[in-house]
Structure formats: C-alpha cells, structure tokens
Amino acid sequence: MAPLMPVAVFGLEVPPGEILIPAASEFPAIIHITMAALDPTKAPEADGQGNIPALPRSTLKIIKATGHDHDDDDEEEDEYLQSLLGGGDSDDEANGGPSDPSKSKKAKQEAAIKKLMAATQEESDEEMEDAKPNGKKGKGKGKASESDEEESDEESDCCGDDDLQLEDYVVCTLDTERNYQQPINITIGEGEKVFFCVQGTHSVYLTGNFVVPEDDEEDSEDDEDESDDEDYDFPLGGEDDDSDDMSDELDELDGTPRVKEITSEDEEEEAPKLVDTSKKGKKRPAEDDAEGLDAMISKDDKKLSKKQQKKQKVEEAKKEEPKKETKSDKKVQFAKNLEQGPTGPAKDKLENKKPTSTVKVVQGVTIDDRKVGTGRAAKNGDRVGMRYIGKLQNGKVFDSNKKGAPFSFKLGKGEVIKGWDIGVAGMAVGGERRLTIPAHLAYGSRALPGIPPNSTLIFDVKLLEIK
C-alpha cells in the first residue's frame, strides 16, 4: 500500500446520548483519526433518569455499516438517510424533495436514526412506510422480530427490501480526572459507511487528517505540470495581468524603436549597414547579448520579430531586382543597427556590448548578474516591481510574470521566499539576474503543484521599478 500523505485537518464532535454521528465527509479523501478527547472543564450531562455518576466518563464506540443499498419507492425515507450519511453538520435544509415544515432537520435526523436502530422490520413496502420505531435503544446490535425470530445484527430499512446492518465496537472510555484523551489510529476509507456514538456524560472530540496516497498526489502534480504553467504564482503571490493595454510594456521599457522609415536618398549611406546586418543574422544586438530576460519572457515580441524578418527578406529581394527607383520610393528598414555609431566596425561594437556575467554566492543563493541596471541599488524596505520566470533544475517552468502588472513586494520583509530577499537586494532598475535558490531558502520539504519537495529553484528576474 502506498504511503498516505495528509492534505487537510479532520475534526468531529460526538455528543453523548448514543446518537449516531456519521464520519462521512464530502471531502474526497481517506480519514485518519489519531486522537479522541473530552473537555474535563465542561459540566457533565445527566442521563435519561437525571443521574450523574460520581466519576463522569464517556465511552466512544465505532459503528460499521455493512450490506448493500438499493433503490426504494419511499423517497422521503431515502432522503432522510442520505441526509444522515452525507454529513449532517450543515444547518441548512436539504434542497429538493418534499419536506414537512413543522419538523426541523434535527427531528428528521433523529427519525432516521430511530429507523437505523429499529429492532423490527416489516416485509411489505406498505408495512415499512407505516412502521414506527419501537423506542428500544440498542447498542449497535439487536434482534429483528421476524416470524422465525432469527437473530441478526441491528438493521435499518434505509433502502426498502434490503437491510443496512450495523456492527459496533468500543474504541475507548474517557473520564474527567485522568484519562481525558487517548491517542488512537483509525483509518476510514473514502466512501466507507462508519458512525460514532458516545454513551456517558461528555462529548468526545475526534481529530486527525484527511489523507491521500502519495502516488495520487504525484500523479496530480504531473497533470498540473502539463497544464499552463503561467496559471501558478506560488513563490511570490502576485498575479499576471493579461490585459491588452499592458501587453507591450516590455517594448516600452527597451526605449528602442523597432522600425525606421528612410527614403531612397538615404539608402546609399545605410547600405553598408544592411550588408553588415545580413551577415550577422536575424537577431537584434540587444537580443544577442547574454540572452537576457527580455529575450525569454515576451512571446508576442518573438512573433513580431518573425514578421519583421519576413518583411526584411521581401525588401532585400526587391533590392536585388534591377529596378529603377525614384526619390518618392520609400523602404522600411529594421533598426537593428541604431545603437551602432556612424563609424567603426560593427563587429567591435557588438563585442563591446556583450555584458560580462558575474557569478557570486550570497548567503547560499547563487547570483549571476546578466545585466547591470542604472540608478540606486534596491535595499531592504524598498518596494520593487519585478518580471520573472521560475524553473526547476530540469528546465520545467512552474511560474512566471511576463507581462501586465509587474509583481510587487517589499524587499527584506519576508513577503517572498528567503532566496528572493537575498537575491534581489542590490539590483538597480533595468538589471537582470539569474538566482539559483537551494531548497532550504525556498520551500524546503513542502510540495506544491509543479514543485516537488526539496527542490532547488532557478529564477530569471528583471527589476522594473523601485518605490
């Protein structure tokens, strides 16, 4: 059997009076109960005769339902039982089906419990609809008053002709002096019909966890990895804004025009640059250097660049054709060399623009400066706006903020994982870094969708603003 992983807290109050309380829950998980306890500070409740024992105590019993459920013509009776088995903790009336406004939901549940605990059962449907509880309170087992007086487990006519058989077992007895809590280890399968009841003076509180097999959790994580990774924003808590008016924000940050319009008079001066551009390839120098974050985070920019490349090929093909051009003819040239000076080899310019990559380790975080920003450095207490892409060591992206409103947080105040507070400190506006954050400075042994436990995380970050 695969190990079980806790996913949520389970709690259940079982009041005294031998009232059957179902353990069933709408939560799709196995229930693992680890503690039973009573509150010794509460006043004890008297029994039916008004007696209170010298040593108040409560006995917890578990009642297991066996047998099979089938359809029944008595819809109202079936509604009562479904309300009981489906978890009667809700204070709202069940939706659908007939109901008697003179009865509260509690009265309905008590009627269903009496049917479960009834000692006799009639054979025909009419007799079952007209039958009333005989008032005898069993302790989990009883005798059915059949013609042959055959002994059987305590039964409930929840589904017409078939019976719901109940078997009870004592779990523990608690008192208010010494034994007011008891560690237990009870696992209830998903969909299993189990009840609890208490005989005594105090309510018993059961606590534990909802658990699922670890294999199921891993399968769920794999499915989530295959989905759109941009839906998650776990390390930082910010959300991507995909509005159209913000989609070109990164282009505005570059401050460099993508297209320049020139006339045929200027073509002779620009011709050497066009030849140099064709030799260098399709990428702009700004995208060539060190593969910064801008080259990775904007799919829209990449698509636009391809269109520009196609236009460039068309223009170059037209130039090669023997055609006379007038001064009024205009051509579109991409501003791939706008940053180059009027003189000097273009190759030297490109080499000078390549930033030097500086790698250092600060408090366990590996910091690789891909691009140095301008202005003052960010310090603790500053509110910073960031773009980022988060990846695992295998290259799988689990989170990102590529466009829209930048992710904003206060540096050094614990609003993000520790590795971010360390790695972002010292950046200037426009700066880009690659942060390699070990597990103990990220999420440790916790597992998140897309992030296995004990994972080293890699973030490519860019600082957009300091407030």
Curated annotation (Swiss-Prot):
Main localization category: nucleus
Origin superkingdom: Eukaryota
InterPro entries per record: NPL (IPR041232), PPIase_dom_sf (IPR046357), PPIase_FKBP_dom (IPR001179), PPIase_Fpr3/Fpr4-like (IPR023566)
Stretches the record annotates as Disordered: 64-163, 208-357
PPIase FKBP-type domain span: 381-467
Encoding gene per record: fkr-4
MF annotations from Gene Ontology: peptidyl-prolyl cis-trans isomerase activity
Subunit: Binds to histones H3 and H4.
EC numbers, comma separated: 5.2.1.8
Cellular localization per UniProt: Nucleus
Keywords: Chaperone, Isomerase, Nucleus, Rotamase
Enzyme class label: isomerase
S-S bridge residues: none
Record field: compositional bias (Acidic residues): 71-80, 147-163, 213-254
Reactions it catalyzes: [protein]-peptidylproline (omega=180) = [protein]-peptidylproline (omega=0)
One GO CC term on file: chromatin
Composition-biased stretches (Basic and acidic residues): 271-287, 312-332
Similarity comment: family membership: Belongs to the FKBP-type PPIase family. FKBP3/4 subfamily.
The protein's role, per its UniProt record: PPIase that acts as a histone chaperone. Histone proline isomerase that increases the rate of cis-trans isomerization at prolines on the histone H3 N-terminal tail. Proline isomerization influences H3 methylation thereby regulating gene expression.
Activity modulation: Inhibited by both FK506 and rapamycin.
Organism: Neurospora crassa (strain ATCC 24698 / 74-OR23-1A / CBS 708.71 / DSM 1257 / FGSC 987)
Protein name: FK506-binding protein 4
